[in-house]
């Protein structure tokens, strides 16, 4: 049996929930949105870098902290999207609407809680985490932190709204709003940083305004009934439904733990990697930047799989859940192979776009090419497949596997391999960096193998949330 064969003979074409045209309309805007976010993000970094080293360092420190919050809001959004998708597949749009309202309640409550905790204790918090940085960097970080924290409620609303629209198969709207948000951010940076010359505060205000603008627009669309199955009803009347909140949190909490712990693991690896020298740090940063572009198809298809597989599970179409999961994985492998092959070929040119020393450039080129090989073979099963499992409600399994794999291989093995190399040859910091990445590839192999087995044994099909 071919795992990734989409066999129409197993069910009549007329009985299939989704056409290939539908899948294309769902996934292509998600790919475009991911690419846009990466490209605009790079432009944003260039604009912010004009503030100076202290400013860009402060922004970088706050962004690392903010990433934990972003992962948390994304996890709640995933929980809401899974529950909403399953109810839509079950032909229970009224339940999907109730899930939407409860998702918004949870997201707003948690985001305002973080605002209430982070703002008064911002000095203590940043000093506790980044106490060794210089005074100018800390001053920049504190200024940017205030504006970033104020944007959390808007970020929560945006993530939740976008996830709900995706659960209905409408990914075009979030793409359009994403374009609007990024234009706001770029224009805001230009006006406030270059024009008004208010420096780091300008970058923070632009972040706040762009997130607020995107959240307000998406929220307004979500409040309109139109022909949508999911919309917010009676928003002026607060409604707390504990059973529905439990369903959302049953997906959101494990996903949040998984995402947050993964981010902590990445930060730890970055911490011990910082001892390998400037060339290794720069090469690692460039490889991560280039690799993130090759992951765009897999990330986009992972988001789309929540809608497709979730609705199949809700409709009790388990065969179709397997079929579409297989098809989406096949598309992921083909698309990531194509993108990774292009990056592999043009690696010298891409790395050459960055101002690096000869040592860093050679190291970045070598690691980027090995990463592209691993990406095309290992990454889809390790990171796209778990979204298929989560869409069915199999979130505890993915959380446990991901956390064990991350600590055992990405952190422990990376540390042991790289430091063994340095112990044998102290001058071989370039080889030590290869050791870090090799540990990460082992992480991909381990989690990918277990997710593959889980998909094959079909136990994930019995984890329905609703």
Give the residues covered by each predicted segment.
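Helix-terminus/linker motif at the lipid-water interface of multi-pass membrane proteins
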Residues: 35-57, 126-135, 191-200, 260-293, ...
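Small-residue hotspots at the loop-to-helix junctions and early N-terminal turns
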Residues: 53-64, 141, 145, 204, ...
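Short runs within selected transmembrane alpha-helices of multi-pass transporters and secretion channels
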Residues: 77, 147-166, 174-182, 203-218, ...
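Short alpha-helical transmembrane segments in multi-pass integral membrane proteins
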Residues: 1-30, 84-151, 195-253, 309-375, ...
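Residue-level hotspots within the lipid-embedded alpha helices of multi-pass solute transporters
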Residues: 34-38, 71, 111, 115, ...
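Hydrophobic transmembrane alpha-helices of multi-pass small-molecule transporters
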Residues: 68-71, 185-189, 215-219, 293-296, ...
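Small-residue-rich hydrophobic transmembrane alpha-helices
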Residues: 56-116, 155-174, 281-347, 379-401
